[in-house]
Amino acid sequence: MDRFGSSKLRIVWVLLCLFMTGLVVMAVRGQQGDGGSQILIFGTAVPLGADSLRSYVLGNLQGVMYWVVSLVVLLGAFGPVSQWTAAAARGERIKGFFVGTGLGFAHGLFLSQVALIPVWALSWRLIGEAWPPELLRADLHGLLLGLQMLLWAVLFARLLKSSSGLALLFTLLLRELGPRLSFFLDFGQDLGWSASQVKVLEIFVRLLPMAQLPSDPFSPLALPLSIGGPMVLGALAMLLPAGGRK
């Protein structure tokens, strides 16, 4: 695991997240009353009106967790894995893709779950629940998205040998493309598309990382395509002839 950073770096990460957790526990509190709900931050009230405190908190924290977990997994593993898959020997590239992605995901899993400690503490202080089911699902979906984005980023890094930054950029752009194409899944037939065309588009969309929380990430079509699709494409990319980075 030293390939993904020193133990000192992980210790600093843990201490930073624990410090933020302490701030959250001391400074933030939620209140729900007959007149509405409010959040107290260092004793200063932030009124939320008549909104349910629980629905307000969970609605916002789900999106935060989905983004934070996926980005931490991606950024925590991409650099070392992309360097491993840039090896001159084909066997080493394939090993780097499969073994490196697995180790990178494990490293990102550790970093992301440590990063969520302040979020769990915030949920507990605001609504009295540390691990509500809605946030647990958002955490799991974020891990799946992070793995999917990591696979796509490594694939792009292999194809775009000149720039790892471009590989990350294309991965993030690809994540934003999926929700836009989902419009045609809902209204494609109303626009004159045939059922087969909509089905082909659905398969393509399933391959892409999604910038919004999915409703059925474990369906028989979704999971094999979202993870297996970029994994197969990445493995094929590792078979391409080696080329030096510019």
Where are these regions (language model features)?
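Aromatic- and glycine-rich beta-strand/loop motifs that create alpha-glucan
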Residues: 1-19
